[in-house]
């Protein structure tokens, strides 16, 4: 953190607004919103973060902020700033993603076409459809039933489609506008699932053709009826009211979010939109940003209603989308939201599983790594990382990979016991000594390779303990990160040297996963420990706030930061007496309390002076 950022952090207000992070080139790399600008922006430069947030913070050299009147105004401003500046760390939906629609043109002799552009031109649009293949399938069926004009430029003679009964041949057609409007209404009814009338008509025509011995024509009608039946089975009925609605659900895990949107048209689920992306703020806030961007895309028409999960701010969504917003509590609509959430969870799990479950790749990776380091295939790899902030609550963590996959039952956490202050080398010495001293004492199976998340100093410390103190023969490698906190170099050998390792190789990806996993495990443990210590210490000594009320506060607000941001009334709602709630706010926000007292004193002084001046 440079001096400019330090100075600006002192000037941040507690108001809602947007903040803009910039890199060394002055480019905007991230835009965020906050209910409390001071708390949110400061959080980036304090404490531990996961890998993706560390990568963002490492690039920040300056920031700006814009104060707004409300949280909703901040949300709207954030969406506009993202759209205008396209910061690389923000959620960005693909601009080129569009869905096909079936359109009946607003012409004297209308046409039935497929388009990806929705215009206010008087045409009738149906969709969107999952892909152009699905739209074409339905259009081909409609062409066989409804004889709309096919030609863009009218030919002087009747066309091929006229002869096969798929065009009215408007050059000789005597039908008026009312006829085509009626046909357009039939198409609309058909696409809404009201197709019984058409099926009955086709059955009648099939029977008539069979009676007159026109078996080929009867077979055509039979095929049409079967095609309609097939289409029915492909479009699952999700709601009985035949409404157009978008159903949102989301799920978060390991710093990633998946949002699923179900497009329900005329009561039928016709498509879903799936997006996975890393998030940096509270999940519900980034979800709102996603919704705002979603409806800025021209291809996403606003439906009759939008269904959202329970934990989302309904008023904020109403400010983003001009339609009916519902947070269903029960029944069919609640089931739709739950289904969207379930699918989001499954999609996110699949993403992580694909990274971990490729047996051939992981097996090949450990074999190649063994050949590269000239050691036996490292079937079992143990990796270590330390975590502390200015020496407070120092911890270390060990993760284990067996056959290239994480073996979570073997993970271990270590509280550093013998080190005072921020000494990474001494912490590494202690944890290596504790781990492999136990391996030696209890005759446990040693790993085939130890991987240290660190540079030459940490690796040499580990070597001293393993080889000189304990007399063990275990290969030790180090993984160094670059200035963007990304896996950069593999260190190995005696003396240590940088190993020539292709960044596109499976062994590199394996080491990257190991480094990310041990880092995640270490900072998660450190965050839990620090939060526990901080929570206990900051709320200790408040009269009337016992262990149970502390537990209720944490269960409701999830974090100490959110308790700090909460109003006295919000704390009272959790079951805390008002006097105790005021004491909590006073202790957690001493600066704000001081300012309020100062303002109150100045007001009293002013009133007193005014009274003295009265005659």
From Swiss-Prot:
It holds the Pfam family HHH_5. The gene is uvrC. It is found in: Cytoplasm. One of its GO terms (cellular component) is cytoplasm. PANTHER family: UVRABC SYSTEM PROTEIN C, UVRC/OXIDOREDUCTASE. One of its GO terms (molecular function) is excinuclease ABC activity. Residues 196-231 form the UVR domain. GO terms for biological process: nucleotide-excision repair; SOS response. InterPro entries: GIY-YIG_endonuc (IPR000305), GIY-YIG_endonuc_sf (IPR035901), GIY-YIG_UvrC_Cho (IPR047296), RuvA_2-like (IPR010994), UVR_dom (IPR001943), UVR_dom_sf (IPR036876), UvrABC_protein_C (IPR050066), UvrC (IPR004791). It comes from Streptococcus pneumoniae (strain JJA). HAMAP family: UvrC (MF_00203). PROSITE patterns: GIY_YIG (PS50164), UVR (PS50151), UVRC (PS50165). The UvrABC repair system catalyzes the recognition and processing of DNA lesions. UvrC both incises the 5' and 3' sides of the lesion. The N-terminal half is responsible for the 3' incision and the C-terminal half is responsible for the 5' incision. The lineage of its organism: Bacteria, Bacillati, Bacillota, Bacilli, Lactobacillales. Keywords: Cytoplasm, DNA damage, DNA excision, DNA repair, Excision nuclease, SOS response. Gene3D superfamilies: 5' to 3' exonuclease, C-terminal subdomain, GIY-YIG endonuclease, UVR domain, UvrC, RNAse H endonuclease domain. Belongs to the UvrC family. Residues 14-91 form the GIY-YIG domain. This is UvrABC system protein C. Interacts with UvrB in an incision complex.
